Curated annotation (Swiss-Prot):
Any single GO BP term: protein catabolic process
Family recorded in the similarity comment: Belongs to the L/F-transferase family.
Substrates-to-products reaction catalysed: N-terminal L-lysyl-[protein] + L-leucyl-tRNA(Leu) = N-terminal L-leucyl-L-lysyl-[protein] + tRNA(Leu) + H(+); N-terminal L-arginyl-[protein] + L-leucyl-tRNA(Leu) = N-terminal L-leucyl-L-arginyl-[protein] + tRNA(Leu) + H(+); L-phenylalanyl-tRNA(Phe) + an N-terminal L-alpha-aminoacyl-[protein] = an N-terminal L-phenylalanyl-L-alpha-aminoacyl-[protein] + tRNA(Phe)
Subcellular location(s) per record: Cytoplasm
Primary location recorded for the protein, binned into one broad class: cytoplasm
The keyword Transferase appears for this protein: yes
Name the record gives this protein: Leucyl/phenylalanyl-tRNA--protein transferase
Enzyme Commission number, as recorded: 2.3.2.6
GO cellular component assignments: cytoplasm
Length: 245
Protein backbone atom coordinates (compact mmCIF):
# COMPACT_ATOMS: atom_id res chain seq x y z
CA UNK A 1 0.00 0.00 0.00
CA UNK A 2 1.42 3.36 -1.03
CA UNK A 3 1.21 5.88 1.83
CA UNK A 4 -0.69 9.12 1.35
CA UNK A 5 1.24 12.15 2.60
CA UNK A 6 -0.57 15.05 4.22
CA UNK A 7 0.99 18.53 4.11
CA UNK A 8 3.08 17.91 7.23
CA UNK A 9 3.86 14.22 6.76
CA UNK A 10 7.48 13.24 6.11
CA UNK A 11 8.55 10.90 3.32
CA UNK A 12 8.88 7.27 4.38
CA UNK A 13 12.33 5.67 4.10
CA UNK A 14 13.26 5.05 0.46
CA UNK A 15 13.66 1.35 1.22
CA UNK A 16 9.86 1.14 1.49
CA UNK A 17 9.34 1.94 -2.19
CA UNK A 18 7.44 -0.68 -4.18
CA UNK A 19 9.43 -3.52 -5.72
CA UNK A 20 9.52 -4.65 -9.33
CA UNK A 21 6.86 -7.27 -8.59
CA UNK A 22 4.34 -4.53 -7.76
CA UNK A 23 4.03 -3.23 -11.30
CA UNK A 24 5.12 0.23 -10.14
CA UNK A 25 8.74 -0.30 -9.06
CA UNK A 26 10.16 2.62 -7.13
CA UNK A 27 6.84 4.23 -6.19
CA UNK A 28 7.23 5.51 -2.63
CA UNK A 29 4.28 7.77 -1.78
CA UNK A 30 1.48 9.97 -3.10
CA UNK A 31 0.29 13.42 -2.10
CA UNK A 32 -2.02 16.21 -3.17
CA UNK A 33 0.61 18.93 -2.98
CA UNK A 34 3.69 19.89 -4.97
CA UNK A 35 4.93 22.58 -2.62
CA UNK A 36 8.49 23.86 -3.18
CA UNK A 37 9.40 22.77 0.36
CA UNK A 38 8.23 19.24 -0.45
CA UNK A 39 10.19 19.25 -3.72
CA UNK A 40 13.37 20.37 -2.00
CA UNK A 41 13.05 17.70 0.68
CA UNK A 42 12.39 15.07 -1.98
CA UNK A 43 15.47 15.82 -4.07
CA UNK A 44 17.70 15.90 -1.02
CA UNK A 45 16.51 12.35 -0.24
CA UNK A 46 16.86 10.97 -3.78
CA UNK A 47 13.12 11.16 -4.53
CA UNK A 48 11.40 12.82 -7.49
CA UNK A 49 7.78 13.48 -8.61
CA UNK A 50 6.35 11.95 -11.76
CA UNK A 51 2.67 11.59 -12.58
CA UNK A 52 0.06 12.29 -15.24
CA UNK A 53 -2.39 15.16 -15.31
CA UNK A 54 -5.41 14.25 -13.19
CA UNK A 55 -3.45 11.92 -10.91
CA UNK A 56 -2.24 12.72 -7.40
CA UNK A 57 1.43 13.66 -7.12
CA UNK A 58 3.38 10.39 -7.21
CA UNK A 59 6.84 10.25 -5.62
CA UNK A 60 9.47 7.82 -6.93
CA UNK A 61 12.85 6.45 -5.93
CA UNK A 62 13.69 3.60 -8.35
CA UNK A 63 16.24 0.87 -7.74
CA UNK A 64 18.51 0.80 -9.66
CA UNK A 65 18.91 4.49 -10.48
CA UNK A 66 20.14 5.84 -13.82
CA UNK A 67 23.01 8.29 -13.50
CA UNK A 68 25.58 9.96 -15.72
CA UNK A 69 29.05 10.67 -14.41
CA UNK A 70 30.40 13.77 -16.20
CA UNK A 71 33.80 12.08 -16.60
CA UNK A 72 32.12 9.17 -18.40
CA UNK A 73 30.14 11.29 -20.89
CA UNK A 74 30.43 9.81 -24.39
CA UNK A 75 30.81 12.14 -27.37
CA UNK A 76 30.22 10.39 -30.68
CA UNK A 77 32.27 11.45 -33.70
CA UNK A 78 29.20 13.14 -35.22
CA UNK A 79 28.47 15.07 -32.00
CA UNK A 80 32.10 16.12 -31.72
CA UNK A 81 31.88 17.49 -35.26
CA UNK A 82 28.71 19.39 -34.34
CA UNK A 83 30.30 20.87 -31.21
CA UNK A 84 33.29 22.07 -33.19
CA UNK A 85 30.95 23.76 -35.65
CA UNK A 86 29.07 25.41 -32.77
CA UNK A 87 32.33 26.77 -31.39
CA UNK A 88 33.37 28.24 -34.75
CA UNK A 89 30.01 29.75 -35.69
CA UNK A 90 28.99 32.91 -33.82
CA UNK A 91 25.31 32.31 -34.59
CA UNK A 92 25.32 29.47 -32.03
CA UNK A 93 25.09 30.26 -28.32
CA UNK A 94 24.69 28.55 -24.99
CA UNK A 95 22.65 30.59 -22.53
CA UNK A 96 21.98 29.70 -18.91
CA UNK A 97 18.67 30.61 -17.27
CA UNK A 98 17.65 32.97 -20.08
CA UNK A 99 14.02 31.79 -19.92
CA UNK A 100 13.56 28.91 -17.50
CA UNK A 101 9.73 28.65 -17.69
CA UNK A 102 9.84 28.66 -21.51
CA UNK A 103 12.28 25.74 -21.48
CA UNK A 104 9.92 23.80 -19.23
CA UNK A 105 6.99 24.56 -21.53
CA UNK A 106 9.00 23.41 -24.55
CA UNK A 107 9.92 20.18 -22.75
CA UNK A 108 6.23 19.64 -21.98
CA UNK A 109 5.34 19.92 -25.67
CA UNK A 110 8.16 17.69 -26.94
CA UNK A 111 6.88 14.33 -28.26
CA UNK A 112 8.15 11.29 -26.33
CA UNK A 113 8.22 7.78 -27.75
CA UNK A 114 5.57 5.65 -26.06
CA UNK A 115 4.27 8.52 -23.93
CA UNK A 116 0.92 10.26 -24.30
CA UNK A 117 0.52 13.70 -22.77
CA UNK A 118 2.97 15.18 -20.31
CA UNK A 119 3.53 15.35 -16.59
CA UNK A 120 4.94 18.89 -16.94
CA UNK A 121 1.67 20.66 -16.17
CA UNK A 122 1.18 24.31 -15.25
CA UNK A 123 1.37 23.37 -11.54
CA UNK A 124 4.69 21.61 -12.13
CA UNK A 125 6.04 24.60 -14.05
CA UNK A 126 5.00 26.91 -11.22
CA UNK A 127 6.67 24.72 -8.57
CA UNK A 128 9.98 24.38 -10.42
CA UNK A 129 9.94 28.06 -11.37
CA UNK A 130 9.85 28.82 -7.64
CA UNK A 131 12.97 26.69 -7.21
CA UNK A 132 14.51 28.55 -10.15
CA UNK A 133 13.89 31.90 -8.48
CA UNK A 134 15.59 30.52 -5.38
CA UNK A 135 18.64 29.57 -7.48
CA UNK A 136 17.95 25.84 -7.11
CA UNK A 137 16.76 24.99 -10.64
CA UNK A 138 18.42 25.94 -13.91
CA UNK A 139 17.95 25.81 -17.66
CA UNK A 140 20.79 25.32 -20.14
CA UNK A 141 19.67 26.55 -23.53
CA UNK A 142 20.94 26.16 -27.09
CA UNK A 143 20.33 29.23 -29.26
CA UNK A 144 20.86 29.58 -33.01
CA UNK A 145 20.52 32.84 -34.94
CA UNK A 146 18.80 34.48 -31.99
CA UNK A 147 16.25 31.70 -31.45
CA UNK A 148 16.16 29.11 -28.68
CA UNK A 149 16.22 25.73 -30.46
CA UNK A 150 16.74 23.28 -27.61
CA UNK A 151 17.78 22.84 -24.04
CA UNK A 152 17.27 21.11 -20.74
CA UNK A 153 16.44 21.90 -17.15
CA UNK A 154 17.16 20.39 -13.77
CA UNK A 155 17.60 20.94 -10.07
CA UNK A 156 20.90 21.66 -8.34
CA UNK A 157 21.87 21.39 -4.69
CA UNK A 158 25.48 21.59 -3.60
CA UNK A 159 27.54 19.25 -5.78
CA UNK A 160 24.59 17.34 -7.21
CA UNK A 161 22.62 17.98 -10.40
CA UNK A 162 19.27 16.29 -10.97
CA UNK A 163 18.36 16.26 -14.66
CA UNK A 164 14.66 16.59 -15.41
CA UNK A 165 13.87 16.94 -19.10
CA UNK A 166 15.26 18.13 -22.42
CA UNK A 167 13.99 19.00 -25.87
CA UNK A 168 15.33 19.82 -29.33
CA UNK A 169 13.78 21.66 -32.25
CA UNK A 170 16.82 21.04 -34.46
CA UNK A 171 19.12 18.03 -34.60
CA UNK A 172 21.46 17.68 -31.60
CA UNK A 173 20.29 20.91 -29.91
CA UNK A 174 19.63 19.13 -26.61
CA UNK A 175 22.95 17.25 -26.85
CA UNK A 176 24.76 20.56 -27.37
CA UNK A 177 23.18 21.90 -24.17
CA UNK A 178 23.97 18.69 -22.29
CA UNK A 179 27.59 18.78 -23.48
CA UNK A 180 27.99 22.32 -22.16
CA UNK A 181 26.41 21.33 -18.85
CA UNK A 182 28.65 18.28 -18.52
CA UNK A 183 31.83 20.25 -18.87
CA UNK A 184 30.59 22.97 -16.50
CA UNK A 185 29.93 20.25 -13.92
CA UNK A 186 33.30 18.63 -14.57
CA UNK A 187 34.99 21.97 -14.01
CA UNK A 188 33.34 22.18 -10.60
CA UNK A 189 34.08 18.56 -9.71
CA UNK A 190 30.49 17.37 -9.80
CA UNK A 191 30.65 13.59 -9.86
CA UNK A 192 27.10 12.64 -10.75
CA UNK A 193 24.03 13.73 -12.73
CA UNK A 194 20.78 12.05 -11.75
CA UNK A 195 18.98 10.75 -14.85
CA UNK A 196 16.19 9.00 -12.90
CA UNK A 197 15.29 6.13 -15.24
CA UNK A 198 17.13 4.05 -17.81
CA UNK A 199 16.71 4.89 -21.49
CA UNK A 200 18.76 3.76 -24.48
CA UNK A 201 19.40 7.42 -25.32
CA UNK A 202 20.99 8.11 -21.93
CA UNK A 203 22.97 4.87 -22.09
CA UNK A 204 24.39 5.91 -25.47
CA UNK A 205 25.73 9.07 -23.82
CA UNK A 206 27.45 7.18 -21.01
CA UNK A 207 24.63 6.84 -18.51
CA UNK A 208 24.48 3.72 -16.35
CA UNK A 209 22.55 2.27 -13.46
CA UNK A 210 23.71 2.11 -9.87
CA UNK A 211 22.05 0.70 -6.76
CA UNK A 212 19.62 3.03 -5.02
CA UNK A 213 21.54 2.65 -1.76
CA UNK A 214 24.73 3.97 -3.38
CA UNK A 215 22.83 6.75 -5.15
CA UNK A 216 21.10 7.99 -2.00
CA UNK A 217 24.35 7.87 -0.02
CA UNK A 218 26.05 10.02 -2.67
CA UNK A 219 23.16 12.49 -2.80
CA UNK A 220 23.07 12.98 0.96
CA UNK A 221 26.79 13.75 1.00
CA UNK A 222 26.75 15.98 -2.10
CA UNK A 223 23.74 18.22 -1.50
CA UNK A 224 25.21 19.93 1.55
CA UNK A 225 28.33 21.10 -0.32
CA UNK A 226 28.67 24.76 -1.25
CA UNK A 227 26.59 25.62 -4.36
CA UNK A 228 28.44 26.05 -7.64
CA UNK A 229 28.12 29.15 -9.87
CA UNK A 230 25.63 29.03 -12.73
CA UNK A 231 27.08 31.32 -15.36
CA UNK A 232 28.80 29.92 -18.44
CA UNK A 233 28.63 29.94 -22.24
CA UNK A 234 29.68 27.75 -25.16
CA UNK A 235 33.37 28.40 -24.52
CA UNK A 236 33.28 25.56 -21.97
CA UNK A 237 33.13 23.19 -24.95
CA UNK A 238 36.72 24.01 -25.85
CA UNK A 239 37.93 22.11 -22.82
CA UNK A 240 35.47 19.30 -23.40
CA UNK A 241 36.95 18.74 -26.86
CA UNK A 242 40.57 19.06 -25.73
CA UNK A 243 42.64 15.84 -25.67
CA UNK A 244 42.73 14.14 -22.27
CA UNK A 245 45.83 14.97 -20.25
Amino acid sequence: MVPWLGPDDPFPPVERALSAASGAPGLLAASADLLPSRLIDAYRRGIFPWYSDGQPVLWWTPDPRMILRPREFKISPSLKKTLRRVLRDDTWEIRVDADFPAVMRACALAPRHGQRGTWITSDVIDAYSTLHRRGEAHSIETWHAGKRVGGLYGVSFGKMFFGESMYAEVTDASKIALSALVFHLRRHEIEMIDCQQNTSHLASLGGREIARKAFVAHVRAAVDSAPIPWSFDKSVLRDLLAPAQ
